[in-house]
Amino acid sequence: MKQYTNAIIFGIAIVASSIFLGKAYTDRSKADGEIRVTGLGKTDFSSDLIVWEGEFSAQNKDLKQSYLTLEKNKAAINKYLVNKGIKSQQLIYSAVKTDENFKRLYSSDGKFIGEEFVGYELTQTVKIESNDVDKIEKVSREITELLNQGVQFYSESPRYYYTKLANLKIQMISKATQDARLRAEKIAEFSGGRLGKLESARMGIFQITGQNSKETYSWGGTFNTDSREKSASITMKLTYKVE
């Protein structure tokens, strides 16, 4: 009799467990009745703003003579750039930086015995910002012609920017959202359901890389300034209910 009673209790427990698990599975399925998709918006564009900088200097033991030489070099640079079609008001010169240079002295047996003053070095930079990308790009390559005038000019690589970035970002968000919705509709269609209302939307990181470059995306966002031709991309993560 006791064994029979135990069997009944065990059977009831199994049935109860089955009902509970079945309900839990149904509730989980309802909770999971949604589609999560990621859409991509991407486009290529060309920079419309160039920033180019260069540095020149003068060295002499006499500070005044160093400054006179620097001013002479500056005048030669200014004339050269204006002759290349750059307006003088576009030339932004930095303040003059002054450094004292010393030579380390050693004894015949290699021991350090002190320093000798060798002169002053005065350094100045010039910067140009322009929407005429072709012109400034050409000047940055030809600036070494100043060497023929005895002017040592150290040219940096140009940096490229896009002034309509805010509008471009809006376009990319729109493209990414459309792409994500299309993916969600296809998933719902293939699963026999119908796409419901949008539950959530989350924007990814805006990335700008050089076209056909080996640059990789970063968590904080990539912002390329080395390439004139660029690619922009952004992702949108959407969650839809499924009906």
PLM feature spans:
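Short, charge-dense linear interaction motifs
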Residues: M1-I92, V96-E243
